[in-house]
UniProtKB/Swiss-Prot annotation:
GO MF annotations, alphabetized: porin activity
Keyword Transmembrane on entry: yes
Encoding gene (name): porB
Subcellular location(s) per record: Cell outer membrane
UniProt-listed PROSITE patterns: GRAM_NEG_PORIN
Complexes and interactors: Homotrimer.
Recorded family membership: Belongs to the Gram-negative porin family.
Main location: membrane
Pfam families, sorted: Porin_1
Entry GO terms, CC: cell outer membrane; pore complex
Protein name (record): Major outer membrane protein P.IB
Length: 331
C-alpha cells in the first residue's frame, strides 16, 4: 500500500510542476500566387510571376506563471516560429520574456513586441506575400531585445514604455525609446504607438539620424464588427544628404463583419509621396486586400484573399496582384 502511494505521489509531481505551464500555437499554411509588372514608359520592363506552397506564420510557444504571494506573479514565455515549410529554426525567435506582474502592472525583459507592433491589428491578414496584407505600413513593426513596462488599466486607459539598449541594437545602430497608450470604452478604442532612435543604418551608405515614428489607430471592435483607421508618420534626417529632413505619411483602414461562420474583410492603405530615408524616392503607393475566413470550428479556419498593390504612377509604376488560399489551426 505504501509503495503504491509513493508511486502515485511521484507520478503526480511532474503534473503539479507543469500545472501553470501552457502549450499553445498556430499552424497555418496555404498556396499563394502573384504577378508583378515593372513599367518603363508605355511598356512592361519586367514581369515576375510565382506560385508556391507557403507557411503563413506558424508558431509554437510555452508560457507560465508562478504566484509569489501578495498579488505578485512571476511570468514567462518562450515562443518560436514553426514553419511547416521548414524555413525557420532556433528557439525564442518570436516574443519571449521573463518578468513580474502585479497591481503595479507588468514588467518584462527579453525579445518583446515593440509598442508600435501592438497597434498592428490594422493588418489582420495571414499571408507570406507582401501583396496579401497591408505590409508597407506595417513594415516598421518589430520585436526588440528590450525591457518593457505596461501599466494597469485605469478607466479604460493603459500605457506602455519600452527601452532597447544600444548593445542589443546591432552594429551602427543606437538605442531606441518606445511609448504608447490604449483607451477602450465599450467597443470603441484608440491606440497610439511611437518610437525614437538617435541613429540607424538603413543599409550600406544610407544612414539616418533622429528617426521617429508615430502611429494613431482608432476604431470599433465587438464580437461581429471590426472597423479601424490608422495614420502613421515616419521622419528622419539623412546623413549622406547634408542631414536633409525627410518624412512619409501613410494611412490605412480595415473593415470586417462576421456572418455566422464567415468573416469577410477588406483593407486599404495609401502612402503619400515621400520617404524618410531618401530624398529622391517618392515611395507613394495604393494597396487593397480583400478576403474572407470560414470557421469550421473555434480552432480551424479556411482562408482566402486577393491583393493589389501599385507603387508610383505614370510611366514608371510598379503593379502587383496576388491571390491565396490557406488553412489555419490554433491549439
Amino acid at each position: 500500500m505504501k509503495k503504491s502511494l509513493i508511486a502515485l505521489t511521484l507520478a503526480a509531481l511532474p503534473v503539479a510542476a507543469m500545472a501553470d505551464v501552457t502549450l499553445y500555437g498556430t499552424i497555418k499554411a496555404g498556396v499563394e500566387t502573384s504577378r508583378s509588372v515593372a513599367h518603363n514608359g508605355a511598356q512592361a520592363a519586367s514581369v515576375e510571376t510565382g506560385t508556391g506552397i507557403v507557411d503563413l506564420g506558424s508558431k509554437i510557444g510555452f508560457k507560465g506563471q508562478e504566484d509569489l504571494g501578495n498579488g505578485l506573479k512571476a511570468i514567462w514565455q518562450v515562443e518560436q516560429k514553426a514553419s511547416i515549410a521548414g524555413t525557420d529554426s532556433g528557439w525564442g525567435n518570436r516574443q519571449s520574456f521573463i518578468g513580474l506582474k502585479g497591481g503595479f502592472g507588468k514588467l518584462r525583459v527579453g525579445r518583446l513586441n515593440s509598442v508600435l507592433k501592438d497597434t498592428g491589428d490594422i493588418n489582420p491578414w495571414d499571408s507570406k506575400s507582401d501583396y496579401l496584407g497591408v505590409n508597407k505600413i506595417a513594415e516598421p513593426e518589430a520585436r526588440l531585445i528590450s525591457v518593457r513596462y505596461d501599466s494597469p488599466e485605469f478607466a479604460g486607459l493603459s500605457g506602455s514604455v519600452q527601452y532597447a539598449l544600444n548593445d542589443n541594437a546591432g552594429r551602427h545602430n543606437s538605442e531606441s525609446y518606445h511609448a504608447g497608450f490604449n483607451y477602450k470604452n465599450g467597443g470603441f478604442f484608440v491606440q497610439y504607438g511611437g518610437a525614437y532612435k538617435r541613429h540607424h543604418q538603413v543599409q550600406e551608405n544610407v544612414n539616418i539620424e533622429k528617426y521617429q515614428i508615430h502611429r494613431l489607430v482608432s476604431g470599433y471592435d465587438n464580437d461581429a464588427l471590426y472597423a479601424s483607421v490608422a495614420v502613421q508618420q515616419q521622419d528622419a534626417k539623412l546623413v549622406e544628404e547634408n542631414y536633409s529632413h525627410n518624412s512619409q505619411t501613410e494611412v490605412a483602414a480595415t473593415l470586417a463583419y462576421r456572418f455566422g461562420n464567415v468573416t469577410p474583410r477588406v483593407s486599404y492603405a495609401h502612402g503619400f509621396k515621400g520617404s524618410f530615408d531618401a530624398t529622391n524616392y517618392n515611395n507613394d503607393y495604393d494597396q487593397v486586400v480583400v478576403g474572407a475566413e470560414y470557421d469550421f470550428s473555434k480552432r480551424t479556419s479556411a482562408l482566402v484573399s486577393a491583393g493589389w498593390l501599385q507603387e508610383g504612377k505614370g510611366e514608371s509604376k510598379f503593379v502587383s496582384t496576388a491571390g491565396g488560399v490557406g488553412l489555419r489551426h490554433k491549439f
